[in-house]
Amino acid sequence: MPSPTYQQFSVTTALSAGVATAFDIPINGCTNWTVIVRNTGATNPVTAATIAVSALGTLFSAAAAITTGIPLAAGTSLDTIVGSLQPCLTARLTLTSASGTTVSIEMVGS
């Protein structure tokens, strides 16, 4: 039996204070995928998060607010972003920190 092929994505970046920052995460047709967000900053929380998906990478669904785990305190992770039986090309995760922070984002899908 062949091993499944996994799609992976990882990025660490700073969020400027009060600026909504979008991350286009390549899901590339994976049926099941999970995104984990970690606030790697020292003090400031992530204060807002939304997710939208695109079938072909051009048109996106309406952004859905992620409320569970938000605000995301410094040094903690949010692992509730899951696409189950939801194939798409791109997931657009938008994060905001009122005071600025640093985040790491990882995704795996199959």
What are these regions (language model features)?
Residues G18, A74-G75, C88:
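Tight coil/turn sites that cap or link beta-strands
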Residues M1-G29:
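Transition segment at domain starts
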Residues T21-I25, S77-S84:
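Exposed aromatic-hydrophobic patches
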Residues R38, S54-L56, T96, V108:
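A generic structural motif
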Residues V46-T47, S99-S110:
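Edge beta-strands of jelly-roll/beta-sandwich modules across compartments, strongly enriched
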Residues G41-S77:
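Non-cytosolic beta-sandwich-type ligand-binding/adhesion modules
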Residues T34-I36, T50-A52, S104-E106:
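Beta-strand signatures of extracellular beta-sandwich domains
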Residues G29-V37, G83-T102:
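Noncatalytic modules at the cell exterior or secretory-pathway interfaces
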